[in-house]
Amino acid sequence: MTEQKHEKKISPRRRARECAVQALYSWYVSQNSPAEIELNFMAEQDLKGVDTAYFRRLFRQTAENVDAVDNIMIPYLDREVSELDPIEKAILRLAVYELKFELDVPYKVVINEAIEVAKVFGAEDSHKYVNGVLDKVAPVLSRK
């Protein structure tokens, strides 16, 4: 008997979040403008199965509100924002943006999605760190 590997179908919104994290990471490491990052991303990435409108909104709005997002999460970090791993920083910024501004998305969905994205892109225990921070941020934003 052979074991069949069952791949979960990744939702268009999950793919949008993954793309937004990648774009935020690129923005952070390249220091290029968000508009330039978005333009390059849209031209160069395979966006099949991605909710591109949601990706664009997440990336643009997270970048635009980065100072507010950072100020929300700073009290719950164990280090300076500048010392965070760039991937963890991108994931946390995106999730905190969603918790604060995307009120139609339940907080549990935001946290779960951030954990799943951290499992894909982050270091071995990134998902635990992301979960710990977001679990403290959500109640402060009256989302829990």
From Swiss-Prot:
Keywords: RNA-binding, Transcription, Transcription antitermination, Transcription regulation
UniProt KW RNA-binding keyword: yes
GO biological process, one term: transcription antitermination
Record InterPro entries: NusB-like_sf (IPR035926), NusB_fam (IPR011605), NusB_RsmB_TIM44 (IPR006027)
One Pfam assignment: NusB
Entry GO CC: cytosol
Gene Ontology MF terms in the entry: RNA binding
Homology family: Belongs to the NusB family.
NCBIfam families documented for this protein: nusB
Described purpose of this protein according to its UniProt entry: Involved in transcription antitermination. Required for transcription of ribosomal RNA (rRNA) genes. Binds specifically to the boxA antiterminator sequence of the ribosomal RNA (rrn) operons.
The protein's name: Transcription antitermination protein NusB
Native species: Pasteurella multocida (strain Pm70)
